[in-house]
Amino acid sequence: MASATFSVAKPAIKANGKGFSEFSGLRNSSRHLPFSRKSSDDFHSLVTFQTNAVGSSGGHKKSLVVEAKQLKVAINGFGRIGRNFLRCWHGRKDSPLDVIAINDTGGVKQASHLLKYDSTLGIFDADVKPVGTDGISVDGKVIKVVSDRNPANLPWKELGIDLVIEGTGVFVDREGAGRHITAGAKKVLITAPGKGDIPTYVVGVNADAYTHADDIISNASCTTNCLAPFVKVLDQKFGIIKGTMTTTHSYTGDQRLLDASHRDLRRARAAALNIVPTSTGAAKAVALVLPTLKGKLNGIALRVPTPNVSVVDLVVQVSKKTFAEEVNEAFRESAAKELTGILSVCDEPLVSVDFRCTDVSSTVDSSLTMVMGDDLVKVIAWYDNEWGYSQRVVDLADIVANNWK
């Protein structure tokens, strides 16, 4: 019986002489890896540098248009994504967005404190302070803070809100998100998978199809944003027949710190003590942005005791015979062209903490790419499920502004 062939990518392969992916705002050379420093102070300095630099080099370049309408933006839900979004937006130069309001039930003191001090991101390099009982100041810009759990009651009409960043994870269907429209907002961008007929867009994959006619849209999930760009490359270059994926995902606020009641019996268990298998719709959701892959992908999630950064493990059968180096070169080519700022390729033997605050949606770990036989492909891709995702939310909001009529 003939033995199966097996190929593993060689880590020595370089792209354009670079041994590491281009993280926006960071150095390109592998001799100066920005994450090689070990102290937390150095990491927090790095975050500060990235946040300041992302305006000039971060984000999806295709979405930047000089003369876009500046939209009045409100953030509904000032949790992990809400605060990451504000930091990402604050770092952009010449943004077509103007954040003027936040709906948060915790009050201005808590909102300003948690924005300034973050256990994952470090201290925000901005002057942040409460303004009275209904506002926070960020580098002198006052943002109004309101508090109401029902979006229909929010003062969006009074404030002239054009776009709401829906970050609660609660109002994800047309009825719920539509309450913002009822309150006077013109459009809603959901920072989670949408339900029902809400259009889903992933920057770098199908966001070019957005039109001004869409009043409520979804930015999909962080995992779909990681998965879809490199799946698109695989399908275009090699033809995906079928596949499965596992995301090893940092724990989130939906889990329990200690064993406690939860509708998901596994998520009811202590997040910091367990590997928690659970469901994810990320693989199936790829079909929402790449319709040709409907019914071809499925997957699960393993929630692990880390606070941030996750990694996708995708295994697919392809129709075109290939080998590991060819797969990686396809990723490099796309990362240098149509997926610049969205996809990157890393040749260094790194671990999850090294990918904190990376601006791209997914970073393929080239040394872990494998091909069994000549048609079974395994790809590993890292993603910052908070920061990287929030950069895409800003990008998609920019696209909304650039298509405003």
Curated annotation (Swiss-Prot):
Compartment(s) of residence: Plastid, Chloroplast
Sequence positions that bind NADP(+): R80, I81, D104, R149, N385
GO cellular component: a single term: chloroplast
Superkingdom of origin organism: Eukaryota
Annotated transit peptide: 1-68
Keywords, in A-Z order: Calvin cycle, Chloroplast, NADP, Oxidoreductase, Plastid, Transit peptide
Gene Ontology BP term (one): reductive pentose-phosphate cycle
MF terms in GO: glyceraldehyde-3-phosphate dehydrogenase (NADP+) (phosphorylating) activity; NAD binding; NADP binding
Chief place where the protein resides: plastid
Entry EC number(s): 1.2.1.13
Site (Activates thiol group during catalysis): H249
Catalytic machinery residues: C222
Catalytic activity line of the entry: D-glyceraldehyde 3-phosphate + phosphate + NADP(+) = (2R)-3-phospho-glyceroyl phosphate + NADPH + H(+)
Pathway(s) it belongs to: Carbohydrate biosynthesis; Calvin cycle
InterPro entries in the record: GlycerAld/Erythrose_P_DH, GlycerAld_3-P_DH_AS, GlycerAld_3-P_DH_cat, GlycerAld_3-P_DH_NAD(P)-bd, Glyceraldehyde-3-P_DH_1, NAD(P)-bd_dom_sf
Similarity-based family: Belongs to the glyceraldehyde-3-phosphate dehydrogenase family.
Subunit structure, as described in the record: Tetramer of either four A chains (GAPDH 2) or two A and two B chains (GAPDH 1).
Anything else known: Plants contain two types of GAPDH: cytosolic forms which participate in glycolysis and chloroplast forms which participate in photosynthesis. All the forms are encoded by distinct genes.
PANTHER family, sorted: GLYCERALDEHYDE-3-PHOSPHATE DEHYDROGENASE 2
Name of the protein: Glyceraldehyde-3-phosphate dehydrogenase A, chloroplastic
Organism from which the protein derives: Pisum sativum
